[in-house]
Swiss-Prot record:
(S)-2,3,4,5-tetrahydrodipicolinate binds at H148, G157, T158. This is 4-hydroxy-tetrahydrodipicolinate reductase. PROSITE patterns: DAPB. Catalyzes the conversion of 4-hydroxy-tetrahydrodipicolinate (HTPA) to tetrahydrodipicolinate. Transmembrane segments: none annotated. InterPro entries: DapB_C, DapB_N, DapB_N_CS, DHDPR_bac, NAD(P)-bd_dom_sf. NAD(+) binds at G7, A8, S9, G10, R11, I12, G91, T92, T93, A115, H116, N117, M118. It catalyses: (S)-2,3,4,5-tetrahydrodipicolinate + NAD(+) + H2O = (2S,4S)-4-hydroxy-2,3,4,5-tetrahydrodipicolinate + NADH + H(+); (S)-2,3,4,5-tetrahydrodipicolinate + NADP(+) + H2O = (2S,4S)-4-hydroxy-2,3,4,5-tetrahydrodipicolinate + NADPH + H(+). Keywords: Amino-acid biosynthesis, Cytoplasm, Diaminopimelate biosynthesis, Lysine biosynthesis, NAD, NADP, Oxidoreductase. GO terms for biological process: diaminopimelate biosynthetic process; lysine biosynthetic process via diaminopimelate. Belongs to the DapB family. It comes from the Bacteria. It comes from Helicobacter acinonychis (strain Sheeba). CDD domains: DHDPR_N (cd02274).
C-alpha cells in the first residue's frame, strides 16, 4: 500500500520516514507533503517518493495518508480528502469541533482512524481503565500525565481520552466531571487530570483508583517515540480493505 506522510518535518513525521525507508511490511512511502523547501535526503530510500507542496498531488499519489501535523493544517488536508478520498490515519491532537465534523463526513467515504496516541500499549491501557472504572465503583479517579517541555497542549490528548474512557464507564457527564484545576474539597463525581511538563519525557500516563486503605495505579511510559510511528503504520495496515467508517484504536484488538 502506498503511504503519504503529512507532517514529515515533525518529531513523529521524521520517525515515520525512517520506518518507511526500506519499506514496512509491504507499505511503501509514495508521497511527502512539505510547506517549505525539503531538506530530507531520500537517496537511501528503497523508493523515492513524490515530495511536493501541492496538496492535491500529494493525496493523489498515495492510498493512505498518515497525518502527524498541526491542527491548522488538518483542515486543508480534510478538504482535499473529501474531494479525493483516501484512507486516513491521524494522530494530530488539539483539533477543533469543526475539524472533527469534517472528519466524520470523510468517514462516510473512506475508512479512517483518529487517535490521540498511536501506541498499542495506550490502547490496552484504555481497555484496562474502562474495566477498573466499572468494577471499582467507589474509587476516586485521578489521571496524571507527564511530557517534554515543548509540548503545546495540556492536558495531553491521550490524558483526555483516558478521562473520557473512565467517565463513560462511570456514566458521568463528560462536560462537567473533568477537573484540571482544583481548590478546596474534591467533588465526588469528578475525575482529576493533571499535566506535568519538563525535560525530554516522551510521555507517561498514570491513572489512579483510590479506595479507603488501598489504591491501584495503571501506568504507561513511552521510552522511545518510534512506538507512535510504528503504531500508526500498523493502523494503516489494519485499515486496508476496511469499510468506510471512523474507527477507534481499541477496535484493533476486538
Amino acid at each position: 500500500m502506498k503511504i503519504g506522510v503529512y507532517g514529515a518535518s515533525g518529531r513523529i513525521g521524521k520517525l515515520l520516514l525512517e520506518e518507511l525507508k526500506g519499506g514496512y511490511k509491504g507499505l511503501v512511502l509514495s508521497s511527502v507533503f512539505v510547506r517549505q523547501k525539503c531538506e530530507i535526503d531520500f537517496s537511501s530510500f528503497s523508493h523515492k517518493p513524490l515530495v511536493t507542496n501541492d496538496l492535491k498531488a500529494f493525496v493523489r499519489a498515495c492510498e493512505c495518508v498518515i497525518d502527524f501535523s498541526l491542527p491548522k493544517g488538518v483542515d486543508s488536508l480534510l478538504d482535499t480528502l473529501l474531494e479525493c478520498p483516501k484512507i486516513l490515519v491521524s494522530g494530530t491532537t488539539g483539533l477543533e469541533e469543526k475539524t472533527l465534523e469534517k472528519m466524520q463526513n470523510l468517514a462516510l467515504k473512506t475508512p479512517l482512524l483518529h487517535a490521540h496516541n498511536m501506541s498499542i500499549g495506550i490502547a490496552i491501557l484504555n481497555q484496562l481503565a474502562f474495566l477498573a472504572s466499572l468494577k471499582l465503583k467507589d474509587a476516586d479517579i485521578e489521571i496524571v500525565e507527564t511530557h517534554h517541555n515543548l509540548k503545546k497542549d495540556a492536558p495531553s490528548g491521550t490524558a483526555l481520552s483516558l478521562y473520557q474512557t473512565c467517565a463513560k464507564a462511570r456514566g458521568y457527564d463528560e462536560k462537567n466531571a473533568l477537573t484540571t484545576h482544583r481548590e478546596g474539597l474534591r467533588s465526588k463525581e469528578s475525575i482529576g487530570v493533571a499535566a506535568l511538563r519538563g525535560g525530554d519525557v516522551a510521555g507517561k500516563h498514570t491513572i489512579g483508583f483510590y479506595l479507603e486503605g488501598e489504591y491501584i495505579e495503571l501506568s504507561h511510559t513511552a521510552t522511545n517515540r518510534s512506538i507512535f510511528a510504528k503504531g500508526a503504520l500498523e493502523v494503516a495496515l489494519w485499515l486496508k480493505d476496511k469499510a468506510a467508517k471512523k474507527y477507534e484504536i481499541n477496535e484493533i484488538f476486538d
